Amino acid sequence: MPKDKYIEIKGARANNLKNIDVKIPQGKFVAITGVSGSGKSSLAFDTLYAEGQRRYVESLSSYARQFLGRMTKPECDFIKGLPPAIAIEQKVIARNPRSTVGTSTEIYEYLRLLFARIGKTYSPISGQEVKRHTTEDILACTRQYSKGTKFVILAPIHVIEDRTLREQLEMYMQEGYARIMQKGEFIRIEDFLETGDENSENKELLDASGEELTQMLKEQNREIFLVIDRASVSDEKDDISRLFDSAETAFYEGDGACRLVFPPSNICYDFSTRFEADGMKFEEPTDNMFAFNSPLGACPTCEGFGSVIGIDEKLVIPNTSLSLYDGCVVCWRGEKMGMWLKEFIRRAEPYKFPIFKPYYELTQQEKDWLWHGLPSEKDREPHDRVSIDEFFRMVKENQYKIQYRVMLSRFRGKTVCPDCHGTRLRKEANYVKIGGKSITELVEMSIVNLSAWFRNLELSDNEKEIAKRLLTEITHRLQFLLDVGLGYLTLNRLSNTLSGGESQRINLTTNLGSSLVGSVYILDEPSIGLHSRDTARLIKVLRELQELGNTVVVVEHDEEIMRAADYLIDIGPDAGRLGGRLVYAGPHSEYPTTDPAEQQALLEKYPESHTIQYLTHHETIDRPSSHRIWNRFIEIKGARMNNLRGIDVKIPLNVFTVVTGVSGSGKSSLIKGILYPAMRRKLDLVADAPGEYTSMEGDVDAIKHVEFVDQNPIGKSTRSNPATYLKAYDAIRGLFANQPLAKQMGFTPQYFSFNTEGGRCEECKGAGYVTIEMQFMADLTLTCEACKGKRFKHDILEVHVAGKNINDVLNMTVNEAIEFFSDEKNQLHEGDFDFCRTIVSRLKPLQDVGLGYIKLGQSSSTLSGGENQRVKLAYFISKEEQAPTLFIFDEPTTGLHFHDIKRLLNAFNALIERGHSLVVIEHNLDVIKCADYIIDLGPEGGDKGGNLVVEGTPEEVAACRESLTGQFLAKL
C-alpha cells in the first residue's frame, strides 16, 4: 500500500503509551484492542482524535474558536495523513428531559420540515382539507359543468368599521357594480337602497356598521353578496382570462372570500384565500408548529414536557392486577371512601362494567368511564357524579381539612398532560396530516413500523419532488436504527431512559446519518448492549460507513468485530506501566486460522499479545465443570413494567445469575425497574416507585442489603480517587501521622489530606496544578509553582515512610503500593505494621479485579465506565464482614478484554463465597456460559419481547431452540 494511504503516528506518549509508532491504513475498518488500561483509549482518543479535532479547530477564525471546545496538542512527535476526526464515545447522550430518540437522531427535525412542506391541514369538525384557494381552483370548479352552463361570481360584502352598509353600497355603485344577492335573489343596489327607506328591517341594516352589522346579519340568518360578474362555462382563452380577473376582483372585494352560484338551483361553492374552514381559522403549517422545544409549538399547559403535576394514575392504582371489586382504586378503600366504590358499581351495572376483571385488562373506554364518568353522568350535577376525577374534585374542595390535604398529597405526581395527552404539542399540530397520519401518531410508532409506513407512503409527483431530500434523510436514519438493532424503540422515547448501549448506538446513527466522507470515525465499544444476534448488523453498518470513504477505528473487545476488521492493533501487553506498547499490528490476512502450525507461528511471533492468544484459543475462559445448587430464591410474580407481559420469574440466591435477551427484551425493566427498587423498599430504603408487579415472594428476608453497581463515576468530585473510595487513604494518612517527625511537628492525619486546609498547598488547593483560562486557545494547565505539583506543603513532604513521602505514595500504582507496603525490608516503627496490613487488604481487591495499573491518587474523572464499575466491585469485596447482599451489575464486561473477564469472574466468585447473591445483566457469552442460572427474556425486543423464553442452567438454555441466547451458547 502506498505510504500516503496510512495515518502515521510517531512517538505517541499520551498517558502510559511508551513512545510508540503506529500506522493506521486509511479507508479501512481498524480494530484497536488490548486489556483494560493498556493504552487503547490513549492512542485512539487522546492522540488520534485529539489531534484531528485540534487541527480542525485551529483552521477556524479566533472568533469562532472561542465558542468551541479548546484542545491541547497531544503528546507525540507528529501525525501524518490525518483527516478530520469524529469520536463516538461510551456515554448516555442526554439527561435533558426534553431530549428524545427523534431529536437525538435528528429524524424529528426532518419530520417537522416534512409536515411543514407537504402536510395537509384537516378540519376537526368536518374532516375536509383546509387550503388557501386560488383562481385555478375556481376554474377547476366550473369545469365540472358542461359548456355553456351559466354561473355568477359573488363576493361577500365587507364593511370597514367606520362605514355603514349604505355608504358601502353607494361606493360600490360609484365603482360600477350594479347588483347584490340576498336570500337567493338578485337585487339592484339602488332598489335595495330605496326599499331601505320603506322597510324598517332593511333600514336598520343599512345604517349599521362593522361588528354591529355582522351581528345583525347573524341574528337574521342573512347573507349579502356583491355580484362581481356573470359568465358561462367555456374553454375559450378570453373567457378563462375574464374568469381569472373576476375571481381576483371577488377575492379583493370579499376580503379573501368568493362564492360561485349556479342558477337556477343556486348550488354554491365557497372559496377563500384565507386559511379557514367550518368557521374556524387555522394556522398554516411551519416547522416550529411541530417543535415541542419552541413556544410556538409546545403545548401551553405542559410547556412541551408531555406531563404535568396532577393525580398520578400509578399512585391511585398501584397494583393493576387487582380488579375494581378487589380494591384496585386505593383512594376508594375504607368505610367512608368505600361508599364511592359501591355507588360506582351500582351505577355501572346497566353498562355491564366488568368489576371482577383486573384493571390492566380493561378496555380504554372502560378506564375512561372509571376515571371521567359513565355516559349517564353527563346529565347530573357535578356534585352528584361518581368517578375518580369527581372524587379528587371533592377532595380539592375540602382542602381546608387537614386529612383531605394529606390525601391529596399522597396521590399527586407526574401525570399525562390533560390537554395534549402526552404528545407535547399544541392541538393545532394534530390537524396537519400526511397519508392520514399526524406527526404525533408517527412518533408513537415503533421504528420497524414507521420504516414500513414510509416505504408504503403514496405521494403526488409534486409532493415527491418537494419531499425527496427529506424522505431520503428520514428513511436512511430509520434504516440505520434498524441495522443497529433498535427497531423496537419509538421516536418519542426519552433519551434519559435509554441504556448506555442504546445511547451509543443512537449517537452512532446521528453521525452515520450525516454521511460525511473522508473522515476518521473513532468508536468506543459500539457493541455495548448488543446481543450476539445483532453484532453482524453492527458490522454491516460500520462497513457502510467505511465504504462511503471513511476510516473506521473501533476500540473493541468483541471477538466477532475483531475478526471482521481489516486491520488489528493490539496495545499491551498488560495494563498501566506494564502496557502502552504495540504488541501486534497486522492486516486481516494474518489473523489466526484453524491451521495449528500457523497459529503456533503467530504465537511465537507475538508472544506478548493476549488478544492473539485468545483468538487462537491458546488461552480460553473455561466453562465451570459444575453449577452451584440453590434452594433459596426471590420470586417476582406478574411483572408488567414497560413491555413485560405479566411474567413470573425466580431469582436464585447465593449463586451467579445472568439475565439475558436481545436489546429491548425487558431485562432492565425486570431488574432495574422492578427487582432493585422493590428490594430497597422491602429493606425500608429510599427508592423510586418500582414497576408493576403482582407480588414478591420467597426468601426475601434472607437479603439484608441490595447494591446496584453501575458505571457512573465513583465520586461526585474530581478530587475523589480509588484510594479514598476504598478507605485505604485513611490508613495511609494514619501511617504518615504515626511517624516520629509527624508526631514531633504535631501533624494529625488531617494534615495529610489534600481536601482540607492544614497540610495541603493552598496555592493550588491540593490539586498540584493551576488552570489559566486562555480565551482563544486551550486553557493552560500549569504545574503549581508553590508546591511544584506535589500537592502538599514542604514540611508535610519532609515526613517519610521507608523513604517515600505522601506525594510519592499517591503517585504509586496499586500494584506498586501493595508491593511497597508488603515489603518486610522496610524499616517501620511500632504500630506501622497494622496500618500497612490495612492498606494492603483494602488495595488487594483492586488488584484482584484487574485494576493494579491505576494510581492511588488518580482522579475518578479520568476512569472509564468499566473501571468505575470495577472500583465499586473492589470496594464491596474489601468489606470483610457484610450481611448477605444482593448485588446487581449492568453489563460489567463493558471495556473488558478476554483477559480481564477471567479476573472479573474470579471476583464474582469471591463475592458468592462470602454468602452474597449476584444478578448480572449481560450479553457476553463468556460470562453467560459461566453462570449458575440464566433468565432469558425475549424472544425479540419491544412489542415482540417481554416474555420469559427459558430459565435454567447454561446447558438447559442452550437446548432451547426458541432462545436466541441458547442458539449462540450451543455453538460454544
Q: Can you name each region flagged by the protein language model?
A:
Residues 1-972:
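Conserved phosphate-binding elements of NTP-dependent enzyme cores
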